[in-house]
Amino acid sequence: MREILHIQGGQCGNQIGSKFWEVVCDEHGIDPTGRYMGTSDVQLERVNVYYNEASCGRFVPRAVLMDLEPGTMDAVRTGPYGQIFRPDNFVFGQSGAGNNWAKGHYTEGAELIDSVLDVVRKEAENCDCLQGFQVCHSLGGGTGSGMGTLLISKIREEYPDRMMMTFSVFPSPKVSDTVVEPYNATLSVHQLVENADECMVLDNEALYDICFRTLKLTTPSFGDLNHLISATMSGVTCCLRFPGQLNSDLRKLAVNLIPFPRLHFFMVGFAPLTSRGSQQYRSLTVPELTQQMWDSKNMMCAADPRHGRYLTASAMFRGKMSTKEVDEQMINVQNKNSSYFVEWIPNNVKSSVCDIPPRGLSMSSTFVGNSTSIQEMFRRVSEQFTAMFRRKAFLHWYTGEGMDEMEFTEAESNMNDLVSEYQQYQDATADEEADYEEEEAAAE
């Protein structure tokens, strides 16, 4: 019941995804061969959200893994949980997308997409009542961004009423892997605005900062970064997988977080984040979690919530705690920082409580916020995009795959529209509406 189908694409998506499965397997007591080794019935109660139970009693992840080159797939397959996935669900090409969005979306990716969709259909038919899809990908490369958005639009056509949630890794401000990231990211956002329901925005730089500043890791690896992401991913869906006092699911999350359909890009955070050495000295309390969770240093994307205002936010707590205390803390946050919340959406923070904490912690919380300050990320990518596009730099790589310059112009203006929409609601006040109605009346 209420299954989620997980899809990972490209190198980044596959690396995040495989880390995520390690976390979820651990939470449900499933060992690398798919056997249940857990100790508590709670782990099995709703294990079918993410797993299919095979006839021999093994649990198989509802996961589809795709890439345009075999390398990362082989790494996943030989990794710690590589044997747990259904072998048919690995779909890969041989050519690679070479960091080129057009290859992922129009040429190489388009050739592979049908075999991916076959696997997706097969998995969806295995579901009792599919709730939605979660896609892990990055927006800077070629496969995750180009082919990822192609898959999202195809799934949107075929399953229009299912939730589509993405975990999207944006290009970072200072750390760049490839020079054409701004192109790939802008073309992807253009697609995500139209076809996704909720996007959790991540970026490597913010994750590096968390590892470096808070977790005191001197040389953070991608493994450390992906571990942070997977903790958040597990937190977002824990309410579906474990019993709780106040449940939430993908659709409830969307209804509570998205006041306007295009503004569905969220900042995420996780608490408690403690360095490995100091874990045992901490006593976790709800106020402490709440404070850390709302802290701007905890946000997993490089935008500062203090530069904008929250339209809405949602907090998912895990562990044994009193819901009354949770509610008090959330009201407390809103009262103390009222200037950071828009006043024309009253009670705009939703909380949910799930009884089962993650492994190794007595309680934890996951934060998802819809803040207007996320426009900083889009604005930054857009500036880099314009700088290159004005000179038509690197454009031949895209037009050579059959793309039109027009598509670039459209993507650019869509991104700029998104930025101005965020700005418009950041500046809006509650009494503007009244003025507007008076003007209307006067006009009539």
From Swiss-Prot:
PROSITE patterns given in the database record: TUBULIN (PS00227), TUBULIN_B_AUTOREG (PS00228)
Gene Ontology CC annotations of this record: cytoplasm; microtubule
Binding-site list for GTP: Q11, E69, S138, G142, T143, G144, N204, N226
Record InterPro entries: Beta-tubulin_BS, Beta_tubulin, Tub_FtsZ_C, Tubulin, Tubulin/FtsZ-like_C, Tubulin/FtsZ_2-layer-sand-dom, Tubulin/FtsZ_GTPase_sf, Tubulin_C
Function: Tubulin is the major constituent of microtubules, a cylinder consisting of laterally associated linear protofilaments composed of alpha- and beta-tubulin heterodimers. Microtubules grow by the addition of GTP-tubulin dimers to the microtubule end, where a stabilizing cap forms. Below the cap, tubulin dimers are in GDP-bound state, owing to GTPase activity of alpha-tubulin.
Assembly, per entry: Dimer of alpha and beta chains. A typical microtubule is a hollow water-filled tube with an outer diameter of 25 nm and an inner diameter of 15 nM. Alpha-beta heterodimers associate head-to-tail to form protofilaments running lengthwise along the microtubule wall with the beta-tubulin subunit facing the microtubule plus end conferring a structural polarity. Microtubules usually have 13 protofilaments but different protofilament numbers can be found in some organisms and specialized cells.
Listed name of the protein: Tubulin beta-2 chain
Species per Swiss-Prot/TrEMBL record: Zea mays
